[in-house]
Regions:
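Amphipathic alpha-helical segments that form well-ordered structural scaffolds
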Residues: 49-56, 96, 191-202, 255
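Catalytic cores of nucleic-acid editing and processing enzymes
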Residues: 118, 122, 166-170, 184, ...
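Generic detection of long, well-ordered alpha-helical segments
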Residues: 44, 87, 106-113, 182-189, ...
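Long, positively charged, glycine-interspersed low-complexity recognition regions
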Residues: 229-273
């Protein structure tokens, strides 16, 4: 039996020149032009993670709104461009920028770096699938998102509606193959609550995940993967009602939003210390 040979894109790091004056193209899905755009910048947690990293650490960039991940060099969003050179994957992009523009995590102890790495893994490899579940597998989540983004899939031309249906079917299969869609919704809700309650405990009374004085790349990850749960209740009301009771994570979301996303509104009232 002949195995399918999948294409592989190797990031051309040697072809890209970045310094403090370089304006990087940040290619990402955006929230579009609707009421939700006042509360979230994107529903892609990896895109929000990367955009937050750029904003936190003053990396010059311009946002390029993309409609499909097919334009990405690995068929993934987000990616960056400098001239005609493309670099993909939010984690690899951040790692490369650390080497050429300075590492905001350099002051962390080995134990702090290890903790940040474990938090990142929990969010990117576990909570991410719960996000996908509500965006594509859950009927109520899909209906809400499609109504907000495009006024309902049934109102679109047939060919666009068919493309959206195929995209949803693809992600539904991914969710089932990965395993998250094999759980009941109550079990999925509990998993999400446990993940974010753990982050709340780790933040404690600090301003950021690993300290009070300054953010690190791990704070961009935490914000990217949790902000929509606070800001968009109608998509996952049971989870949102729970996370809004978490005082430390809630204050963190409010801090990052207020400082680095002044154009956004807060959809909740954070607990005061």
């Amino acid at each position: 039996m002949t195995m399918i040979q999948y294409p592989l894109y190797e990031n051309p790091y040697g072809d890209i020149r970045v310094d403090a004056d370089t304006v990087i193209g940040l290619h990402m899905f955006t929230a579009g032009e609707n009421d939700l755009a006042s509360y979230v910048t994107s529903f892609s947690p990896f895109a929000v993670k990367l955009q937050t990293y750029f904003r936190m650490f003053g990396i010059r960039h311009e946002r390029v709104s993309e409609q499909t991940n097919a334009v990405g060099p690995r068929h993934k969003i987000p990616f960056i461009s400098v001239g005609n050179t493309l670099i993909t994957d939010s984690g690899l992009i951040i790692d490369h920028l650390k080497t050429v523009l300075g590492d905001p995590d350099a002051h962390l102890t080995p134990a702090q770096k290890a903790l940040g790495r474990m938090v990142q893994g929990a969010l990117e490899d576990h909570l991410y699938w719960i996000i996908l579940y509500y965006e594509f597998f859950s009927d109520s989540g899909w209906d809400f998102l499609s109504n907000v983004m495009v006024g309902g899939a049934t109102n679109l031309p047939a060919e666009i509606q068919e493309a959206l249906d195929l995209r949803r079917a693809d992600f539904r299969k991914r969710c089932y193959d990965q395993g998250i869609a094999r759980f009941t919704e109550a079990e999925i809700i509990d998993k999400a609550k446990r993940d974010m309650a753990a982050i709340d405990v780790l933040i404690d009374n600090k301003r950021f995940l690993l300290g009070d004085d300054r953010p690190t790349s791990h704070d961009a990850v935490v914000f990217g993967f949790t902000q929509a749960f606070f800001q968009v209740r109608d998509m996952h009301p049971e989870i949102t009602d729970f996370v809004r009771t978490l005082p430390n994570l809630g204050r963190f979301i409010a801090t990052v939003t207020t400082r680095w996303y002044p154009e956004l509104k807060l959809a909740f009232e954070p607990h005061q210390p």
